[in-house]
């Protein structure tokens, strides 16, 4: 079996530790592939797509830690984050006070220990369209509870 080098970090990768991209380049599963979202399709992506996605996640994670995490803890209801439901493997949050939306993926090293958060942050202006569904159900006390499910469609441009 031929060994290849990772196109991003230069590490030598073998058959079980490589991920082949659409343009024929290889990336390592141990380091570089873990820097992307799990829902990101690496098989159909090129090297440029993967590096742009990794840069976007690094920048989005910094913005998440600097702006969104303090807003999660605020007591002001107008600045509080709103969660977007309906996304499969990522959690979405909208910050009405800043005009930003974030999609995060939480990863754990073991069970609930060693949590790391990866985030992609977009402007609300990048939202092209969305579909929402309102579901009404009754809880255990007999009160009506409404759950809003939102499916956003974004114009994926990097945040500047």
Positions of PLM-derived features:
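Short coil-to-beta-strand transition motifs
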Residues: 116-128
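Surface loops and adjacent helix of pleckstrin homology
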Residues: 18, 104-106, 132-135
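A general secondary-structure signal for short beta-strands and their flanking turns/coil
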Residues: 1, 117, 147-151
């Amino acid at each position: 079996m031929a060994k290849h080098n990772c196109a991003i970090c230069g590490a030598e990768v073998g058959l079980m530790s490589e991920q082949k991209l659409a343009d024929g380049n290889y990336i390592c599963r141990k380091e570089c592939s873990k820097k992307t979202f799990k829902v990101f399709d690496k098989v159909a992506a090129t090297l440029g797509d993967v590096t742009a996605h990794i840069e976007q996640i690094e920048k989005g994670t910094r913005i998440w830690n600097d702006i969104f995490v303090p807003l999660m803890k605020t007591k002001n209801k107008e600045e509080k984050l709103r969660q977007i439901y309906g996304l499969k493997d990522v959690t979405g949050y909208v910050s009405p006070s800043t005009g930003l939306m974030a999609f995060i993926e939480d990863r754990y090293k073991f069970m609930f220990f060693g949590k790391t958060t990866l985030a992609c942050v977009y402007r609300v202006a990048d939202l092209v369209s969305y579909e929402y569904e309102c579901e009404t159900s009754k809880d255990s006390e007999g009160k009506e509870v409404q759950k809003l499910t939102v499916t956003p469609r974004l114009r994926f441009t990097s945040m500047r």
